């Protein structure tokens, strides 16, 4: 799959190029030209899935064409091995606290 810059002023990139570069030459973010649609079954059963399984299925929609399923699953489960609390902000708004991971980055 090819990736484009959100600023649309840089050459297309492969997944490897996008990951290694981080940002496109025009300072845009790399996005895939197409993202596989998640099936309705995913949404119907999302409340029964672990955070890691949800992340894997979403990552597969972005990268599945370029990364073998078992490799992608291993990457997701290794990198998201920490608790992610779901915190109520207001009556109908919740937030995932992603900053509890080892890098405190999110």
Regions found by a protein language model. Give the residues of each.
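PLP-dependent amino-acid enzyme catalytic core
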Residues: 1-106
């Amino acid at each position: 799959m090819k990736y484009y810059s959100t600023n649309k002023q840089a050459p297309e990139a492969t997944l490897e190029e996008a990951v290694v570069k981080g940002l496109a030459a025009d300072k845009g973010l790399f996005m895939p030209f197409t993202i596989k649609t998640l099936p309705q079954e995913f949404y119907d059963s999302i409340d029964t899935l672990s955070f890691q399984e949800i992340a894997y299925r979403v990552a597969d929609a972005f990268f599945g064409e370029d990364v073998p399923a078992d490799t992608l699953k291993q990457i997701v489960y290794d990198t998201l091995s920490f608790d992610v609390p779901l915190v109520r902000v207001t009556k109908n708004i919740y937030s995932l606290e992603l900053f509890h991971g080892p890098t405190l980055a999110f």
